[in-house]
Amino acid sequence: MHIRPARAEDAAAIAPVILPVLEAMELPFLARHGLETTRTLLASAIAHPAYRYGYARGIVQILDGRIAGAAFGYPAEDEAQVDAPFAVVLQQHRLDPTQLLFTDLEAFPDEWYLDTLAVAPEQRGRGVGQALLRALPEVALARDKTRIGLNVDEANPGAHRLYTRLGYKTVGTRELSGHRYHHMQKTLNGRGH
């Protein structure tokens, strides 16, 4: 297993890993445009470094020479701009640039926000997600953030237990695309713990 920063050339391999997470969120965009169109648009947008899932905002786990999982996030103060590159991709594909994947605010102030943690379906149960989670403190600290935040669906108690076990605490709630989420945070001590 090897974790490294995502690269622009990873875009086509990352998109199908992230897509099931977006599908589970029941985003209106997917219902409107379908999985294949969304995958194509997502792959194009990942090549933009400033995008929510832009390669410069992500790390990937390589297993057996392939991307087994990915984690994407950003400092909370970047949230207002993270979807602008997707609007450009929509225009390039002659689609309405106001029809973004996400419309809700997700981050809490002054945190490095883990937007998405995704593991390829065939790689689940191999510790990929936990390895990516353990790598995040270094990512957050490199961006001068001493707190990591994330949202976990209230309907997913297993994930909530995992994050709790890894030191995250529930600090609030969010409603995203009609689903209720626990907002959890982990405070770092400067050494990544």
Where are these regions (language model features)?
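A short beta-loop-alpha structural element at the N-terminal edge
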Residues: 2-16, 24-28
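Conserved GNAT-fold acetyl-CoA-binding loop/helix
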Residues: 23-46, 57, 91-94
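A short helix-loop-beta-strand connector motif used in the catalytic cores of GNAT acetyltransferases and
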Residues: 47-60, 77-81, 113
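Conserved beta-strand in the GNAT
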Residues: 60, 66-75, 113, 118
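Conserved acyl-donor/pantetheine-binding loop and adjacent beta-alpha core of acyl/acetyltransferases
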Residues: 77-112
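Conserved acyl-CoA
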Residues: 105-110, 120, 131-147
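C-terminal "cap" of GNAT-fold acetyltransferases
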Residues: 110-111, 145-160, 165-167, 172-193
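Conserved acetyl-CoA-binding loop-helix of GNAT-fold acetyltransferases
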Residues: 125-138, 161-165
